[in-house]
Amino acid sequence: GNDNTSATPEVLVAIGELATSIGAADITEIEFVSTAFDKSDGGNIDMLVRFNEPVTVTGTPQFLVTNNTSSSRNVTCDYLSGSGTNELTFRKVTAAGNAATNASDVLKVVANPVSLNSGTIKDTGSNTASTITSSVAIGTAAGTLTVAA
C-alpha cells in the first residue's frame, strides 16, 4: 500500500484509462479488400489497415501500394473511412483503362506504407498512432492484387 494520504484522487480515476494512454496505437494487420482488379473496367483499389485500438483520423492520410512491375505506377490510396474504430479504409478510384496500372501488374504492400500527408491518426489517449509496420510480415500477409486486362 501507499501511505501517502495527500495523493490526488483524480490519479486513481485516471488509472482506468491507463492502458490506452501508455503507448501509441500500432498497425496489427493490413489487407487488400479484393485480390484482383480489371483495368478495362476500372474500379476501386481498397486497403484495410487495422490497429490494436480505435484511432481518430483528421485530414487525408495516404497508403502507398507498390507496383512490382514499375515504381512509376505505384498507387496512392487516400483515407476514406473508419475514424473512431480500429479499422481504416484507404481507397484509390481508378478509371477504366487508366495508365496507372497495366495487365499483369502485381500490386503489393511494403514496409511503412502509411503517410500522414499533413493529417493525423491518433489513439484514444491522443497519442499519434504509429504508422510504422512492426514487421515485414504484416505487409506480406496482406497478399497482392493482380491486375487483369
Segments from the language model and where they lie:
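Non-catalytic beta-sheet/beta-sandwich ligand-binding modules that flank or precede catalytic cores
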Residues: 1-149
